[in-house]
Design a protein with these regions (language model features):
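Signature aromatic-anchored transmembrane alpha helix within multi-pass, membrane-resident enzymes
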Residues: 41-86
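Hydrophobic/aromatic-rich transmembrane helices and adjacent perimembrane loops
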Residues: 7-49, 54-55
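Aromatic/acidic, Gly/Pro-rich catalytic loop(s) in extracytoplasmic/lumenal soluble domains
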Residues: 117, 121, 130, 157-242
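Membrane-interface helix-loop-helix junctions at transmembrane boundaries of multi-pass membrane enzymes
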Residues: 1-4
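Short phosphate-engaging motifs
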Residues: 21, 146, 191
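Short periplasmic/luminal acceptor-recognition loop of GT-C membrane glycosyltransferases, typified by
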Residues: 71-76, 85-171
Length: 242
């Protein structure tokens, strides 16, 4: 059943164009089951019994050395600069491990960077507002990672920010939480010229520039005031799933 389960999920992941590491957790189970099957089949053979005293220490040493070699791929034990040298030396460097190209680091590593800087700018901007504006402001993020970072650090550090809103995935379902789209702190990658078509006042309050973050997480953070009557808010238009 283990082998059949793997085959079924492999086909499903292939058809759905899933990310390559989604099946990774099942491989240790397959290796363990395969090892038992091989041992039952070959352990009693005279040649295997005679040479196992040498074979097992060699195998164990190979497993330990290989495990140490690939350990940085499974645990964040290296600093970013050391990681880049490591992957370059082993020819493992790839700038596209998910749906978009990354910079120096693959996305699963790059996505660990930049969130504190982003939230610090948002919190500073929020605290610069009057109490009345703080009560009504929207904090809008372009994707669930940005919105999730705001909500996470808001709770952890007691920043007293309103909930982040976003049109991305489940955040769209949670709506706008009653905030006023006439005043927005926006973490988006749109240009000031494009935003000015929707808002009368567009102020850059900070720049996201953490070196090792994903390229699309570099950009401006805005304070927007005065939604133009020619561009009314339609929450349904903000919905995007990927």
């Amino acid at each position: 059943w283990i082998g059949l389960t793997f085959l079924i999920f492999y086909v499903l992941m292939f058809v759905l164009h899933a990310k390559d590491y989604y099946l990774a957790p099942i491989y240790p189970v397959l290796f363990a089951a395969g090892a038992i099957a091989w041992e039952r089949r070959f352990a009693t053979r005279p040649l295997v019994a005679a040479e196992r005293v040498f074979a097992f220490p060699i195998l164990e040493a190979a497993l330990i050395l290989t495990g140490l070699l690939v350990l940085p791929m499974t645990s964040p034990i290296l600093r970013p600069a050391a990681w880049v040298r490591y992957t370059t030396a082993l020819h493992l460097k790839s700038n596209k491990t998910e749906t978009t190209s990354s910079g120096e680091l693959p996305q699963f590593y790059a996505d660990r960077f930049g969130w504190q800087q982003q939230v610090a700018i948002v919190a500073r901007t929020f605290n610069s507002l009057s109490p009345a504006d703080q009560h009504r402001v929207c904090i809008f993020a372009g994707n669930y990672g940005e919105a999730g970072a705001i909500d996470f650090f808001n709770r952890r550090d007691h920043l007293n920010l309103p909930p982040a809103i976003s049109g991305h995935n489940n955040y769209w379902l949670w709506g706008m939480h009653g905030c006023d789209p006439d005043l927005v702190i926006a973490v988006i990658d749109d240009s000031p010229d494009d935003i000015s078509k929707k808002y009368e006042s567009v102020t850059i309050v900070g720049v996201r520039d953490t070196p090792y973050a994903m390229p699309f997480e570099h950009g401006n953070i805005y304070l927007l005031r005065g939604r133009r009557p020619s561009a009314p808010v339609n929450w349904a238009d903000e919905r995007h799933y990927y």
